[in-house]
Structure formats: structure tokens, C-alpha cells
Amino acid sequence: MSKFEVTHLNLFYGENHALKDISIDIPARQVTALIGPSGCGKSSLLRTLNRMNDLVEGVKITGTVTFDGDDIYANIDVKHLRMSVGMVFQKPNPFPMSIYENIAFGLKAQGVKDKAVLDAVVENSLRGAALWEEVKTRLHTPAFGLSGGQQQRLCIARAIAMEPEVILMDEPTSALDPIATHKIEELMDELRKKFTIVIVTHSMNQAKRISDKTAFFWMGELVEHGDTEQIFNNPKDHRTQGYVSGHFG
């Protein structure tokens, strides 16, 4: 079952044709990795899935993107879409407030005031991000006091708190050390049981370790996509072969 269906998508930043006739289905409750060299369009596609590209001046989009069958550019309220499709960025971006308030912020913005409800969501979200045991005694201390890896897991917990169906991740471990990266990858293995995950990564090894599906982009084109094992072990296109083998890119 597809969570997203992208059909003949073209995206322009002014005169720059960043995505060229992209068609891809993204399956539910699996991890899909988007790979390719810098500037190939993978982050542009990621940000199209929750309409973050709307915020870029001069952007133009043609084609269709459906989320659970609904055209996200025609039939879905953007606010609702972004609640359903959470995002974790390259660098951890905790809010300048306590660990607790980072998680509760979105719920409070929606009008939730019941402390018991907030407490439960904060704990469950931190547990879901494998962070609870590390922070449960300091929930009301500043989030900036956490390590980089902990901050990134906090950002994942913040996304989980809104009960999304999808989590988009734009190189979520590129600023982290190997130990923190390993924890995030272990976490993603658990998250896939509940959420659809789409991740942009420059690490071929990471894509092989964590993803069910892989899509390879090159100069704005989707060259090839399919099962991760097939993409890495038996690619059909010579450009894919060259990239995953490290010959270029």
C-alpha cells in the first residue's frame, strides 16, 4: 500500500529545473532512502511531500502528489498535512526551552491544557524516541544541555508527539558522531513499525542498513528505485552502479 504517490512531478526554483518528471510510489510503514550526489533533487522531493517548498520564493510545481489518495496540492489543508507528515532536519533544532516544553509545545498550540495528558504524551514520545531513560530526571532543564545525538532524538520525539503518519528525515545523522548515529539507526528500526519514513542520506552504508526501498537521483532525475537490496546488488542503470560502487558522485 502506497502512502504517497508522486506522478510526473516537475519542480522549478525560478529557472532551475530541480525535479524532472518524477514518478514514484512510497510504501506505508517502510523506510525509503533517497540517495544521490549533492544537488540531485532528493531534498527537493522530500520537502515536496509536506509542501515545505511552498515557502521558497519563485517555486513552481507541476504534476501530482497524493497522500493516502488525496492530492496534497488540491484537496488537503496544509496545516493538517504538516501535522500528518513530520520532519526531522539535518542539524538538531530543539526549541530554546526545556526538554518537557519541547515535546508539549505542539500540543499546547492545539489547545491541549490537561497536565495529565501532556505528561503522558511527553513520556510516551520520549520513550518512542529511546530518550526517556536518559532524561526523565531532568525534564525541566534546557534542551540545549543535551548532546547532539540526544537533541536529534528529542526532535524525533517532538515529531512523534503530534502523532504523524509519516516522518521525513533530511540527513538526520550527518552532524552526529558514529555512536549517536547508531542509536538513531536503531531507533528508526523501531519507528518503521508505526510510521512511514522517508530519509535523505549521503551514506551508502546507512541506506543499505536501514532502508527497505531506495531511490537514486541524478541531476534532477529519478534514475532508478526499488528494493534496497536490488539497487545496491543488482542495479539496472549504469549510473546507479557507478554511484553505489563509489566510482562517482
Swiss-Prot record:
Residues of the ABC transporter domain: 4-244
One GO cellular component, as annotated: plasma membrane
Subcellular location, principal: membrane
InterPro entries, per the entry: AAA+_ATPase (IPR003593), ABC_transporter-like_ATP-bd (IPR003439), ABC_transporter-like_CS (IPR017871), P-loop_NTPase (IPR027417), PstB-like (IPR005670)
Compartments, as annotated in UniProt: Cell inner membrane
Keyword Oxidoreductase: no
Function summary: Part of the ABC transporter complex PstSACB involved in phosphate import. Responsible for energy coupling to the transport system.
Binding site for ATP: 36-43
Membrane disposition: Peripheral membrane protein
Any single GO BP term: phosphate ion transmembrane transport
Assembly and oligomerization: The complex is composed of two ATP-binding proteins (PstB), two transmembrane proteins (PstC and PstA) and a solute-binding protein (PstS).
Broad EC category: translocase
The reaction(s) this protein catalyses: phosphate(out) + ATP + H2O = ADP + 2 phosphate(in) + H(+)
Domain of life: Bacteria
Protein name (Swiss-Prot/TrEMBL): Phosphate import ATP-binding protein PstB 2
Keywords: ATP-binding, Cell inner membrane, Cell membrane, Membrane, Nucleotide-binding, Phosphate transport, Translocase, Transport
Organism encoding this protein: Shewanella oneidensis (strain ATCC 700550 / JCM 31522 / CIP 106686 / LMG 19005 / NCIMB 14063 / MR-1)
